[in-house]
Amino acid sequence: ESRGLGDVYKRQTLTLAIIITLPMLQSCLDDNDHQSRSLVISTINQISEDSKEFYFTLDNGKTMFPSNSQAWGGEKFENGQRAFVIFNELEQPVNGYDYNIQVRDITKVLTKEIVTMDDEENTEEKIGDDKINATYMWISKDKKYLTIEFQYYGTHSEDKKHFLNLVINNKEADSAAENEDNTDDEYINLEFRHNSERDSPDHLGEGYVSFKLDKIEEQIEGKKGLNIRVRTLYDGIKTVSYTHLTLPTKLEV
């Protein structure tokens, strides 16, 4: 399913203002101030297919049980949806979970599958190759998600949707294979692609996107990391060699 940045930009603007203080909010949960709020990025997991109950898995593998999940009964969360969660930690433990929390806010993060570029549905023209910066990225401990913090230019109006994709480009892979000097079997080659849909580059904006890694799950095992091609805002095409297939410390609870 294609989703544009316009769908999430309005909520993300508020979230990003909070994320500026992310290291301070997430440094630790203060035992002396149980009303202090923390912010984390997590994965929403349904407890069962027939239930609206859910829990959160943090990128360090720990789990959080939302004691007030009924308050979010009217919200539709897909299993595996990524989200920013603002919460208070509660003292009473819940069996089977690392944390018992009271949820204050949930902001969905754009969550997508990796796509393979082809000559039919996912063409070069449709996927696009407009400028974008990948300012920060990390892989969850279970290696199920790659999350990218990015910057791009646009009007940031709701009727101007941009599209993001993490792409397997077999044409480039075949070309690289012809030249042994450009082939590195220890890395998986991917491309972070942006289609601005000809939006006017009026203002610099930021956002977050998470990509599911199930399509390359088997290939990741035994690899050093990922080579991610990005057409940057100011420096042309760059390839980021990402070797830290673990969670950054600033996002640990």
Model-predicted segments: where are they?
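Single conserved hydrophobic/aromatic residue that forms the stacking wall/gate
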Residues: 1-9, 244-253
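Sec-dependent N-terminal signal peptides
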Residues: 14-21
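First exposed extracellular module after export/assembly in secreted or surface-exposed proteins
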Residues: 37-245
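C-terminal motif of bacterial Sec signal peptides marking the signal peptidase cleavage site
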Residues: 24-27
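Generic structural signal for beta-strand residues in well-ordered domains
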Residues: 1-2, 21, 219-221, 252
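Bacterial signal peptide processing site
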Residues: 29-31
